[in-house]
Amino acid sequence: DALNEYMIPKYHIEVEFLPLQYAEYQQTIQLMISGGDELDVMPIYYSNASSWIAMNGIVDMNQYMDTPEGQAIKDVLGEANATVGSMNGILFGFPAQKESVELGGLTMRADICDELGIAEEYGLELNQDEYTGKVYDWSVATEIFKKVKEAHPEMTPLYLQGSASPMRRLAFFDELADQFGVLDWEADHDSTTVVNEFETDTYKEAVTQLAEWFDAGYIYPDALTDTQGSAVMMKAGNTFSYMSAIKPGYLVEAKASTGTDCYAMYFGQDVEGGYSTTNVSFYDTGIATNSADPEMAFKFISALYTDPEVMNLWQNGIQDVNYKVLDDGTAYYVDGEDASNFKYHQNTGWFMGNQFNTYVWNDGSKDANYWDKLQHHNDWAQYSPAYGFMWDSSEYSTQITALQNALNTYRPALETGSVGVAGVEETLQKLNDALYAAG
């Protein structure tokens, strides 16, 4: 009601939300599109874009980009990011303002790092997780794992599991939406040649490194089949570290999930990190063709990116009723409410609109400058030469399913190191033979 009290006089728009659980989002939206149900503004996960466009379910917003509202979106996102949610010339959505570059590394137990002198050697500190340009080669991790293994043979230096690929932490490929045909960023930042990721030297070197760690006893021996997860294993004291994407405020989240203080170290071959289309255009905000008034829907989308009052009302509710602004400029629950009993609070700005226009929520990991820190984090990255390209795979769904099945057969063993160094060549050959056989 408060949002409409603001929207109606200013924009002549009345808003009605349709709350959905994440698990039901894709099916519900798809049924609404195909069934002709009235639907205006919607989040679009990048992998759904091709099929929903093929269903004629998404409005091409190019027609609105020369309007004042379209220009306002470009002013916020920049020209490149404002048009990144495009396929076959159709502008289907705008990306959320969020951290979009994946700078990866290790999350490590602070007590073990302190005990073994690792923290002192590398200048590690609690809650020091902002990227400053300092990045380490993975050979440094080998030395750290060796120290931990010698001092604590009962503990696994590195936890991996077969269901969660670590490849994005080890090497950056522009996966061009589905990774069956990629740009090998590590080999050549400027190349636009599409290659088979699993035949590249970059991929082979990465899985060989994992196999060496596995043979040395540095990786959890049941990594291929284990389902417990890194947080559970660290909380139980069974592992020293795990691979993760790191960003400002990350270590507070890590402590909450693992129950222990952690340090973070950035690792990788590529110092800057890379921007691919799907890094930025992971979730987009678009308009359904079922919309009763696409032009007004576009004006609402523009408000999500340009009007702080709209985003704060949607995300935080009414000031001094649902949240209060603290002396440091951050927002928090009103007196008498907390995470267990709040009446209204969203945490969805990361997938729709411009969360940088909202108050930073004081969860213990962030200060009022947090959005500036995320933008600075993004600014380290370089754009892939294929940035803005998203392959339309809708005509190849059968082949992609067969390729995915082939990949799932061999990838977990390779990417947990479980094949050992002796098995890398043979398993890679089997994987590529299966991929070519699948089309």
Task: Describe the residue ranges of each PLM region.
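Extracytoplasmic/secretory soluble proteins
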Residues: 1-439
